[in-house]
Amino acid sequence: MKSFVTNWLSGLAMGVLASATITVQAATDQVIRVGVTSGPHAQIFEQARRVFERDNPGYKVKIIEFNDYIQPNAALDAGELDANSYQHRPFLNAQIKARGYKLYAEGKTMIGPMAIYSRKYRKLEDVPVGARIGIPNDPANESRVLLLLQKQGIIKLREGIDPLTGTNATPIDITENPKKWKFVEIDAAQLPRTLDDLDASAINADYASKAGFNPARDSLLVESGDSPYACLIAVRDKDRAQPWLGKLVQAYQSPEVKRYIETEFKGGILAAW
């Protein structure tokens, strides 16, 4: 009987010790807080999170979703996030210039092609003279649309526009507009809702996807795959040497995540690596 009690107590002690060890281990996991915009960025980063946590014991990723393009950088700069994943370099550069953020970008993630959609017209050439076209009201994406239209030969911009150096185009930089299109600047998140009122609107891929659009299938005009507007993972400048950053990029750029992008979005979103 004494032997039984001794063995039972010994087993109980070992169980308590094992439980405590697991609890301590869980408590020491480093949590990386990553901000994303809802839609494709959130969906894809969930896949990257799974790969990252699988391959890097001791780390956890907490994904925090936002519904606009301004707050993820504000939260990152304020230390409320450790990283974000939703923006291309021209947008980041514009935010740094305008707001004084000390942010650093590492690793390409995906390209969400900018595209022009309409509920009134099926072809770009059908959009009439004097049409009202919705475009994003942030400098980087507004410039992106105007450069796309210039590449298509619909408008012409003044010389010297280079979004990668922060020289963005606005409607006042249009020097030729033979179709006399009127550009209406609207918050990017609201552009899908404008399609009943405007002749057409240029919509970022994440907001287009949330509204049920696929740029490869539904648009009048879409960026090509060689677009310079690849999205990135951003951190505060002081965190650029953190060991988890390279691991996070590696997880995002894994074969599993690429396969998910190709299967889930069917050309509507492209892997940028």
Range-by-range predicted roles:
Residues V31-I32, S38-K62:
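Short, polar/charged alpha-helical segment
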Residues I63-A74, I161-R193:
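Short helix-initiation/N-cap motifs at beta->coil->alpha
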Residues E106-K156, K258:
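A conserved helix-loop-strand patch within extracytoplasmic ligand-binding domains
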